[in-house]
A protein has these predicted regions:
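C-terminal binding/interaction regions
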Residues: 2-27, 82-142
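Charged, well-structured alpha/beta interaction segments
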Residues: 27-31, 46-47
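Short beta-strand scaffold segments in enzyme catalytic cores
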Residues: 31-42
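A generic structural signal for short beta-strands and their flanking turns/coil linkers
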Residues: 32-34, 50, 84-86
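Glycine/charged-rich beta-loop-alpha catalytic/anionic-binding loops adjacent to active sites
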Residues: 42-56, 87-88
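Compact, glycine-rich, soluble single-domain proteins
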Residues: 52-67
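Short HxH-centered metal-ligating active-site micro-motif
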Residues: 63, 67-95
Length: 142
């Protein structure tokens, strides 16, 4: 299997997992269902975790699908270290193809927890990376 075959397979697998997660979104206000899937390298091997957006009447408390999935990924890592996220996929069931790009808060979460990950969006053919999503991003020098 070539690297291109591997990436194509990963993309299909993660987008399918994100689509399944989106079906479980709680969106009584916007009716805009989003799912995300994250590939994580763990000591036991590669795992896929997912999350869906969960809305709240106080909109600022709404949890995006990307952040839900990244929070789940943190549970798979070593305590005190970020998870080893290799790829993230996002699907919006009620979105036009390519419309479901991450919000600013999710982009910052990606910068913190998945800086080297490939980013797949349903309807966008190219594989995106953090520099595409958040150029000149804020970081703290540690």
């Amino acid at each position: 299997m070539t690297e291109m075959d591997h990436l194509a397979g990963e993309r299909v697998e993660l987008l399918a997992a994100a689509r399944e997660a989106a079906a479980h979104a709680w969106t009584p206000y916007s009716h805009f269902r989003v799912g995300a899937a994250v590939a994580v390298d763990t000591a036991e091997g590669r795992r896929i975790v997912s999350g869906a957006n969960v809305e709240n009447a106080s909109y600022g408390l709404t949890l995006c699908a990307e952040r839900a999935a990244l929070a789940a990924a943190c549970q798979l890592g070593v305590a005190g270290e970020p998870p080893r996220v290799t790829a993230v996929a996002v699907v919006g069931l009620d979105a036009q193809p390519g419309e479901c790009m991450p919000c600013g808060a999710c982009r910052q979460w990606l910068a913190e927890l998945a800086p080297d990950a490939a980013y797949y969006v349903e309807g966008v053919e190219e594989t995106l990376h953090l520099d595409d999503l958040l150029p000149r991003r804020f970081t703290l020098n540690r």
